[in-house]
């Protein structure tokens, strides 16, 4: 069973309210639980297989509807190649959006679906940031979670609303169709750790190129 974890430390609840309150910690961390050996890990970073002269899109099919993402291949070729390679390998199939915060973002890419654990290097490698401060973190933006500089792996988040995050997270795409599905996912009931009470599942991710 694959074991991953993504911990978001940007918001806390206070005063008995479910509304988020910003703290001084504005980091989105990728962490990993220790447990069963992963069914699918890699010994090294994937080789570049995409053509930066082509246009790539992904249809992220979820249990609540589909979202089509257009990738920023020229801005973040390494990150796009990583996501596409993992998606084609079925890495995201059956993974849930394990952390959902309305009016902020939805997080996925953590096959364990948990919210606690030790830092780790999964899916078996980490790769460098491709930061671009010319692209705002606006609604529909797709970006990588990390646990510090140059620690990207498989986990990602999609912005529910425009938000002035620090430019610490590689932006590598944007939802161009099905943006209403972000609203649907962001509106689900959540429990401890901002995890949806009922699983929101990534059924599969279909990649196209032109």
Can you say where each PLM-predicted feature lies in the sequence?
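Sec-dependent N-terminal signal peptides
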Residues: 4-12
